[in-house]
Amino acid sequence: LPAAFDSFTLLHLSDLHLDADPAYPAALIEHLRQVTYDLCVITGDFRAKTHGPHAAALAALAQVRPHLRGPVYAVLGNHDSIRMAPGIEALKITLLLNESVPVERGGSTIHLAGIDDPHYYQVDNFDKVAAHLPPEDVSILLSHSPETYRHAAHAGFDLLLSGHTHGGQICLPGGIALMTNAACPRSFCQ
């Protein structure tokens, strides 16, 4: 990282499934009060169901958003619908749908990029998102699924942040994932 980004901290949230339990937004807000960070990223799955109404998830996100400090960037997950995008962006959360943004600090720049979830709609476009990234700059890719790791590496991204595996759905002692819900190495799902 450029020296200007020493001590720069990202808060990475994923798989919030905000409409799964009415008590969840308040619990999340309580945890958010205890952390310090410069920028927040959310790697999808704002809602619990993969189809149907999404108003409850957006209402819960509206409760949480005032407690997220700094800029907030996100990608959609396999539970989310593009129909949610206007509601998410109305909350001042920037969705990165096969696009990137520069993040500047102290005269230096890193790039934050996001791709669409590869599962249902299969509209993730690595060529488009990586096309304008300077190879000498640090680039971070947001992807809901860690299964994109090979594409991310070939596209030249320095870091991939993803969710989807819920830390490995079922883990043995020591954090060894038995079930990952992803077609990638288990070590990528922790």
Regions found by a protein language model. Give the residues of each.
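Soluble catalytic domains of enzymes that build or remodel membrane lipids, polysaccharides, and related
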Residues: 5-12, 18-190
